[in-house]
């Protein structure tokens, strides 16, 4: 793991979990259904990310709400919200605010404790295989709380682990968490294995143009997760998601 990621994990463990909350499972919004609707409307399904680090600062809740509304307006199928505060300058409150836009919301953080799953209501939660957590247990725990797990992988070994669980959504991160380098060929290399298993597949990181977006779709992506490219201007979403 890159030293930057190690530092984030160390800070997260030192910070400890927030107060646990509870919510009815029937309130969960469905990413797969939302992506299917986007396709019917002639759009590439994009999970648009609220990533304060891209602007180098935390965001006021009014700004978070404005991004979420803009993403909904420009056709996002879901919103990803970074909640890690130390490096990515996110917050749990950003999830609550983003959900008011009406789209499925993915909580994106470095989840290493089941207690963290109870911190905020989200529709989906990121589980990173590289953190060496018990994926079976965390997938079951997330579902029990009404959240759909999105299991993130970067290698063949991690893909095998993810496919051995009950996970229905797998994200392939084109960013190497050891070097932080981005390579779209990562998705192209790992996608066939997941396609054979019939899971819903998300391409993460490295999409900066419509050419990149179409390349990931051709390689088998059911949805794309795009962050940095959209923070400078949410209207870019309307250019990236055209089939």
Segments (PLM) and residue ranges:
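An N-cap/entry alpha-helix motif that binds or orients negatively charged groups
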Residues: 1-59
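Conserved, mostly hydrophobic/aromatic
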Residues: 8, 48, 71, 120, ...
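Active-site beta-loop-alpha junctions enriched in small/polar residues
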Residues: 11, 51-53, 84, 110, ...
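N-terminal active-site wall of soluble small-molecule enzyme domains
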Residues: 45, 56-150, 158, 187-193
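Glycine-rich phosphate-binding active-site loops on the catalytic face of alpha/beta enzymes
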Residues: 77, 81-83, 123-136, 172-179, ...
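Catalytic cores of alpha/beta
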Residues: 105, 112-123, 154-166, 197-226
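Glycine/small-residue-rich hydrophobic helix-like segments
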Residues: 169-206, 210
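C-terminal helical cap(s) of enzyme catalytic domains, especially alpha/beta-barrels
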Residues: 184, 189-194, 217, 230-243
